[in-house]
Regions:
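Alpha-helical ds-nucleic-acid-binding substructure associated with the helix-hairpin-helix region
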Residues: 16-19, 51-52, 56-127, 182-184
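Residue-level marker of regulatory loop/turn positions in helix-turn-helix DNA-binding domains and
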Residues: 36, 40, 114-117, 128, ...
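Histidine/lysine/aspartate-rich catalytic loop segments that bind and position anionic ligands
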Residues: 105, 128, 144-148
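C-terminal accessory module of base-excision DNA glycosylases/AP lyases that mediates lesion recognition
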Residues: 1-29, 114, 119-120, 133-142, ...
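A general alpha-helix detector
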Residues: 41-46, 62, 78-82, 120-124, ...
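A positional/architectural concept
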Residues: 8, 15-61, 65-68
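Structural motif
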Residues: 32-40, 87-91, 180-187
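Short alpha-helical scaffolding segments that buttress acidic/His motifs in well-ordered protein cores
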Residues: 42-47, 96-100, 139, 190-194
Length: 205
């Protein structure tokens, strides 16, 4: 599902950033696809931690083929060795178990999560071992539908800025703040197109 803000964001960024305008024109019909399954979205974020988009895509395909109905109770029944065959590290497997337990123990919160303030969502999710700021950013971006995520802790995001805006890594915080101000309130759109400029397949979680 395309975010409601997407087309407005494209127009806004095209008018305010010549670099992004060229990328947007290169991929005119593509867009960020929201994942309404909050559980799957968080699992996808864990799988995608610190690996390439193509590697994450391969692991996700194997993982979601393990069971026709990937839900917390089913995942907790999966043997660790079976999950390792999908390409998951032991650490990520433990994180997946942690998320599964969280969803089983917090059904009321999950059922109403899109009604909560994002500060509350962050405070709740950060307590899950394995879920950090990057994972929460991906969740807010790809599930909750926040239009203004600026994930400065994402390596691909920083790599794209370095490449497209001719800045050496580490990029100065002052410059990142200028970009954030320029792109606001549509940093999520900018982020997605920066990723798209690097990867042969669109990023999804």
């Amino acid at each position: 599902m395309k975010p409601k803000y997407w087309n407005k964001g494209k127009s806004y960024l095209s008018n305010n950033d010549t670099v992004l305008k060229l990328i947007i024109e290169k991929f005119p019909d593509e867009y960020l696809k929201l994942n309404a399954n909050f559980y799957h979205a968080l699992l996808n974020s864990i799988i995608g931690q610190q690996i390439s988009v193509s590697a994450a895509s391969s692991i996700k395909k194997k993982f979601f083929n393990l069971n026709k109905n990937i839900k917390p109770s089913n995942v907790l029944k999966l043997n660790e060795n079976i999950l390792k065959l999908c390409g998951l590290s032991r650490q990520k497997i433990l994180y997946i178990y942690n998320i599964s337990n969280f969803f089983l123990e917090n059904k009321k919160f999950i059922a109403n999560i899109d009604l909560y303030d994002e500060v509350i969502i962050k405070e709740k999710l950060i307590n899950i071992k394995g879920v950090g700021n990057w994972t929460i950013d991906m969740f807010l971006l790809f599930s909750i539908g926040n239009s203004n995520i600026f994930p400065c802790g994402d390596l691909g995001f920083i790599k794209a800025i370095s490449k497209l805006y001719k800045k050496e890594i580490p990029i100065k915080e002052a410059y990142l703040n200028r970009l954030k101000k320029r792109w606001s309130p549509y940093s999520s759109v900018a982020t997605w197109y920066l990723w798209r400029s690097l990867d042969p397949i669109p990023v999804s979680y």
